[in-house]
Amino acid sequence: MKRIACILSLLAGICLISFPVLAQEASEATNAAAAVEEEAAEPAAELNGANTAWILTATALVLFMTIPGLSLFYAGLVGRKNVLSVLMHCFMITAVMSVLWLAFGYSIAFGDASPYFGGFGKLFASGVNSESMSGDIPEFLFFGFQMTFFIITPALMVGAFVERMKFSAMILFTSIWALVVYAPVCHWVWAGNGFMLESGTMDLAGGIVVHITAGIGALVVCIMVGPRKGYPTAQFQPHSLPLCVTGTGMLWVGWFGFNAGSQLAANGDAAQTLVVTHLSAATATIVWSLAEKIKNGKASVLGAVTGSIAGLAAITPASGEVGPIGALAIGAASGLVCWYASVILKSKLGYDDSLDVVGVHGVGGLVGTLLVAFFAASSLGGKQGADYAIGGQFMTQLTSSAITIVYTLVLSIIILKVVGIVCGGLRVSESEEQDGLDISAHGESGYN
């Protein structure tokens, strides 16, 4: 715990030092953008049928990542007496987040009140109708596409507290967290006037917005809820690796909609994004398996599928800027670094991140967010021109990551404190944990 406290203190220091720099950059960029807008107003965009068709498909693919992709992946990793509880968590998060996105989330994330907060002008999709546009696609389609990201991000955190957290506490925590952590960070990075976007932060599909926030939130939850009974001496083995492999396959395919869909167009950029996404996942799979082979003498199926997800998480922020060489490098780095974080570092620090959300998504998202600064350069196969400054971009990426880490850390702690009071504690009783959450929380059994 002391080591964890030291790490968190260091991150807080980085954030406090670097926040003024990023805020100043955002202010200058916002003023410049306002001046341009005053000079000439852009004409209203017309609907592009090809782009609309692609984003409709991508929206379905990203929803497919959560139900059933992530649900099956997590369900296979837990014990037999908790398989339904994990499926229920992901399924209920999908339902609750969909309603919250309509009511509050979209407005907070994509309103234009300020560079730091979207405001309440679009509550319950106010002003959004079948005629309104977002670029050259219907705004309702953009609303739906972004809703799938709002769904999967809190669902990712489920893997950190499986088999021990109260169902009511889980629902309340993820609901508040999505609105006060995810939605504001989404606004900073992806809204047209968000201060991180204006400062030049690169994050096409959610290295910061999705993976770093989910990873840090997961770290806080698994520490505050506490480890599973018997951890770390007891052996917690996946009850169904075939389910894990099936879920991973769905995630891998769905990630094409996640990343390539974030280009919001059916064009060459989307095609390149799809290819580099696949290459990063493939490379990370190989590297993770090699690391296992060297350390344990055998490469496991679980290691291969976990490595692929690490590569997918890491390429998420970079997929719009890097070429195939950059994808191979980011995949290799994430495969090795995430393996170390999930296998070695977690054991040393002693926290029970049950399904390695921190090591795979948090660390993977950070790796990709930082490395994009290097591999976006044209000299390394990226899309940026000759005047691109790697050092300056790296500092921008580091600053945005640090701010997000500290913000997510602090808010997650506060939310969990409140949820613990409201729900009479965060975790189930020892007897309920022993019986398994399928029976104790839902009155059903996954296998009869």
Task: Describe the residue ranges of each PLM region.
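N-terminal secretory/membrane targeting signals
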Residues: 1-28
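Glycine- and aromatic-enriched membrane alpha-helices
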Residues: 24-448
